[in-house]
Amino acid sequence: MTGMARVSVVSIALLAALCAPRLHACETALLLAMDVSNSIDPSEYAIQTEGLALALADPEIAAIMVDDRVALAVLQWSGPGDQALMLGWTEIAEPADLAGFAAAAGAMERPFVLSDTAPGAALGAALDAIERAPPCKRRVIDVSGDGTPNSGPPASAARVRAERMGVTINGLAIESPGSGLPVSNYYRQRLITRDGFVMTARSHRAYAETLRRKILREIAQIIG
């Protein structure tokens, strides 16, 4: 093979590599799993949905999501048979994608009322949903809630399943004074995976800012 032919072959191979579709279209598939059980009153539900919309509108979060083509979905959960994928998987390829998703998140209507708290069942549904996510390098489930279980299966089986799938489970615990067993402790001990973390909002009013910091940590892959 002549030098010119060799250069041509290398150039064609390089061009093909650059033009080939990436195996992972996105960096992170992030499923937001929101507690809407009986302990969440209507005003607290509004705080959660509005807080999610505000977090997604944060300029730093928006820049990372577009640059990394993050895939988002929202699941709401309560009792053992009560889980609903409210917003299906959406790849954030441009700012308009995120703006539309944030608007839809803020307008979500509550699917369940007067129901129990079953995070173990919620995790099972979340894992089923994340199996249908676009191909991404990382898959993360972000569980938020203000109570410990009062029904449904233990979360341990779902946590083992998540670790086998390579899915990270993180938690956002909403706690109020006098709420009994700290939700943060339950999330740390029973819910999150070994590579996961928990952040705590000390009231529902602190939810939006805590969620913003949590999502930023998840998509920026900040360690510690």
Question: Where is each model-derived feature located?
Answer:
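VWA/integrin I-like adhesion module and closely mimicked acidic/polar interface patches used
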Residues: T148-Q189
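Exposed acidic/Ser/Thr-rich ligand/metal-binding surfaces
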Residues: L114-M165, L216, A220, G224
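Extracytoplasmic/secreted envelope proteins and their assembly/folding machinery
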Residues: Y45-A53, A57, R69-A71, L87, ...
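Bacterial N-terminal signal peptides that target proteins for export
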Residues: M1-S11
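C-terminal "exit" segments of structured domains
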Residues: M199-G224
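Von Willebrand factor
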Residues: C26-G88, E91-I92, A99-S144, N170-V183, ...
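N-terminal signal peptide c-region/cleavage motif recognized by signal peptidases
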Residues: A20-P21
